[in-house]
Every structure is written in structure tokens, then in C-alpha cells.
Regions:
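Catalytic cores of phosphodiester-bond hydrolases, prominently lipid phosphodiesterases
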Residues: 1-149
């Protein structure tokens, strides 16, 4: 759930609404994950255990905070200006792989947001080792993934 407004107030509203659905909040196979304008990690302990968070690269988390992280994600544009069609430079490739591997080293899946959003870029993201592809073209990505099988 991508919080777009003030983090703590939005999260409190979300928690209040979700508590009306205990079958969802108690479901062990559903991970409710907050991203975007989140509270600082030191405040995560104030949220109920059914709320998980989107971690960020370069932040050192306590063991308790790490337990609340569902994935690590970052803006693609912070690491590369690749447009999805030109050749990805070796320097950019190394930066991208390093950030993905850092997430994997703490047993967390990784995603980039603000990526080029079409089949050629999805192919490259998979090759780089991302675990989750961020997209606004859900139908296109679903078709792409089905055709890859």
C-alpha cells in the first residue's frame, strides 16, 4: 500500500480500517506492506504486527525492524538513467546488481520503482535479479510473464 500523504496519519487510518477485517489481518498468507511516505523505522514498533514495511537500501535496520520488512525497494533512477532500449552500461549494471545482491544478503526480495515499463526492460530486470517487477501495465506484464514460461 503506497502511502501518498503524511505517513503516520495515513498509516493510523489504514490500520483502523484494516482492523475491521480480522480475517484479513490474521491471514498468514497475506502480507500487508506499506510503502511510500512511511514513518521512520524507529516508529514501526507502534504498528500492529500485521503491518509490514518496504525497506530502503543503505539503511541499517535493527533485528526487530528487519522482521517487519517485506522487501527492499528503490527508485531505479537513483542508480541508472537507462531508458530500457539502449544498452545498459557496465557501470550501471554493476550498481544495480550490487543493490539487488545487498537485499538478497539479508534475505529480502528486491524491486525497483520508476523503471522503464515494457517487455525489453522487464527482461533486463529479470536478468539483473529483481524479485518483483513494478508496473503500471499489469495486463502487459501478465501477458509477458505467461509467454516466458
Amino acid at each position: 500500500i503506497d502511502l501518498k500523504t503524511e505517513g503516520i496519519a495515513a498509516l493510523n487510518t489504514l490500520v483502523t480500517r484494516l482492523k475491521k477485517y480480522p480475517r484479513l489481518t490474521a491471514c498468514k498468507t497475506l502480507m500487508i506492506t506499506v510503502s511510500g511516505n512511511m514513518p521512520i523505522p524507529a516508529l514501526w514498533k507502534n504498528s500492529p504486527p500485521f503491518i509490514h514495511f518496504d525497506g530502503r537500501p543503505g539503511i541499517t535496520y535493527t533485528p526487530d525492524q528487519q522482521k517487519r520488512i517485506r522487501l527492499i525497494s528503490a527508485s531505479f533512477l537513483s542508480f541508472s538513467k537507462w531508458n530500457g532500449t539502449d544498452k545498459l552500461t557496465q557501470r550501471d549494471r554493476e550498481k544495480l546488481v550490487a543493490i539487488i545482491e545487498a537485499a538478497h544478503a539479508i534475505n529480502k526480495p528486491f524491486r525497483f520503482w520508476a523503471t522503464p515499463d515494457f517487455p525489453e526492460s522487464w527482461t533486463k530486470l529479470i536478468e539483473l535479479g529483481v524479485d518483483i517487477i513494478n508496473t503500471d501495465d499489469v495486463v502487459g506484464l501478465a501477458t509477458f510473464l505467461k509467454e516466458r514460461k
